[in-house]
Amino acid sequence: MLRPRRSLGVSSPAKQRKKAAPKNSMATRANRKRLPSYLKPGSAVEISSDEIGFRGSWYMGKVITIPSSSDKDSVKCQVEYTTLFFDKEGTKPLKEVVDMSQLRPPAPPMSEIEKKKKIVVGEEVDAFYNDGWWEGDVTEVLDDGKFSVFFRSSKEQIRFRKDELRFHREWVDGAWKPPLEETEEEEDESEEDKLDDSEDEEDILARVDLETTRAIAKQMFSSGTVVEVSSDEEGFQGCWFAAKVVEPVGEDKFLVEYRDLREKDGIEPLKEETDFLHIRPPPPRDEDIDFAVGDKINAFYNDGWWVGVVIDGMKHGTVGIYFRQSQEKMRFGRQGLRLHKDWVDGTWQLPLKGGKIKREKTVSCNRNVRPKKATEKQAFSIGTPIEVSPEEEGFEDSWFLAKLIEYRGKDKCLVEYDNLKAEDGKEPLREEVNVSRIRPLPLESVMVSPFERHDKVNALYNDGWWVGVIRKVLAKSSYLVLFKNTQELLKFHHSQLRLHQEWIDGKWITSFKSQKV
C-alpha cells in the first residue's frame, strides 16, 4: 500500500534465481563534473527514493550539502525533507544522503490553462498522499468532482479531489517533459503575431545541449540508418533532405548518401559529410492533422522539406503556404505537407504556437470502477495461463508467463513459470505468491498506429514483460524505452513491445491506440 514514510530501512537483497531488471549501464548526467544549476545548498528540490514501497513518489525538501569539487567521483548530496521527520512530534526534519540522480527541481505549478483543463480517464497524474507526490493513472471521473487513481506500484485505487492532483511530468535532460502548457495570454496572440514569431536555426541551437545531442547521434545513427540532413549552405538553411548513413566518421560526423540529390553526373546519389547538429531521424507522421492558419509546417519542394507557414486554409484540396526565406507564396496538396517539428536533445518538439497537438488520453473500460479489493480465487481455474508479478526487489513492474497450480489458504497460490527455471536449471520454477500478484493474459491487440513518445509499453526482456515508456522513436520500427525504476534506456524492435494494459477489478484498462482482437 502507499504507506507513510517515516525512516529508511535496508531491505534484504533479492534472490538471484530470476534475471534481474535492466540495470543502468549508461553514464548518468550526474556523472558530469559540472553540477546541475538547481543543486546548490539551500535550493528547494523534490526527492525520490529507491526504497521498496516508495518508488514512484517524490517528496519536497532542500539541499544541505553538494559533492565536493575536489572529489570527482562523488555523486552524493545531503538533503533535508520538508514533510518527513525523525520524531513523531514533527520537530526534527528527516535528513538523508542521496544520489544526485534522485533529485530534481520542484515541479512547476499548473498554468491557468492546466487548472481549467479537464482531467480525463487514462490521464497520468501525481497525487498528493501521505506527505508526498505519487505517480498514478486516473481510472474514473466521479460525480462528486473526485477522481479514482490507480497506483501500479501498490496495486491500489484511491479517490482524490482535483486540488490533490497535478499532471505528471518527467525531468529529462534538464527540462520538464511534457513542457508546461502556455498561459491564455500567450495563446491569445493575433495571426499576424504568429506569422512573425518564427524560430531560426540559432534559436533552436540555443535550446540544444551539445553533449547530449552528440551522444544521442552516436548511439542512434549507424550504417544504413534512414535520416534527414540539413545544410548551412546559403539558400538551403532550414531545409531537410532524406538520406541514409553510409558510415560514422570520427566522434561526431557521418558520411551520408542522399535519397533524392545526385552527383554532378546526375546518376550517382550525392554523398557528403555532415556533423551531429545537422542530422536527425525522420519525424513521426501526422496524416490525421488538419492544418490551420498560422501553423508552422514543412512543405516538400525541390527534393527537400522547407519551412513555411499556413496562410490560407484548405481550398479545393490545397493549402496556401508562405515561405519567409524566399518571400514566396505557394499552394500544396495535403500529401506534400507535414507539421514542423524540431529535434532537440533526442526529442521531437512542436512549435509553441500554431500546429500544437493536444493528444487526449482515453481508455476503453467500464467507468463504474468499484473500490479496490483482493482478487477472487474463482477468477482463475487450476491450470489457467496467467502472468505473475514477483514481489522481490528488482522485479517491480515486471510480469512473467506462468500457469496456476493450486490455491493455498485464502490469499496464496502456487504457480509454475513458463520460462524461469529452478536452481537445477532443468525443472520449471514453482513459487508461492499472493493472489493479488497474478492476472490473466492481457488482451491481444492490433496496433492502429506506431508507438509514439510517452506511450506506456511492456518490453520483452530477460524472459518477462517490463513496464516502460517510449523515450525515442528510431528508424526501422525500433524504439528507445525508458525503465523508470532503473532509469535504464534500452533499444527494442516493435515486435518486442506491446501496449501497456492494467488489470483493475476484473477488467482490462487498455489504450485507445490499439484494437482488441
Curated annotation (Swiss-Prot):
Source superkingdom: Eukaryota
Annotated segments matching region Disordered: 1-35, 177-202
Stored SMART domains: Agenet (SM00743)
UniProt region (Plant Agenet, chromatin-binding), positions on chain: 37-111, 117-173, 219-287, 289-345, 378-446, 449-505
Any GO BP annotation: DNA methylation-dependent constitutive heterochromatin formation
Pfam family, any one: Agenet
Keyword tags: Chromatin regulator, Nucleus
Subcellular location: Nucleus
Cellular component, GO annotation: chromosome, centromeric region; heterochromatin; nucleus
Annotated knockout phenotype: Abnormal transcription up-regulation of some transposable elements (TEs) and of hypermethylated loci (including MU1, GP1, SN1 and ERT7). Hypomethylated DNA CHG and CHH regions. Reduced H3K9me2 levels. Increased ratio of decondensed nuclei.
InterPro entries referenced in this protein's UniProt entry, alphabetically: Agenet-like_dom, Agenet_dom_plant
Tissues in which the protein is found: Expressed ubiquitously during vegetative stage, in meristems (e.g. root tips and shoot apical meristem), and in ovules and young seeds during reproductive stage.
Chief place where the protein resides: nucleus
Function (record text): Heterochromatin-binding protein that preferentially occupies long transposons and specifically recognizes the histone H3 'Lys-9' methylation (H3K9me) marks, with a stronger affinity for dimethylated H3K9 (H3K9me2). Required for transcriptional silencing, non-CG DNA methylation (e.g. CHG and CHH regions), and H3K9 dimethylation (H3K9me2) at some loci. Mediates heterochromatin phase separation and chromocenter formation.
Domain notes: The tandem Agenet domains (AGDs) mediate the specific recognition of the histone 3 lysine 9 dimethylation (H3K9me2) mark.
Protein name: Protein AGENET DOMAIN (AGD)-CONTAINING P1
Name of the gene encoding the protein in the UniProt record: AGDP1
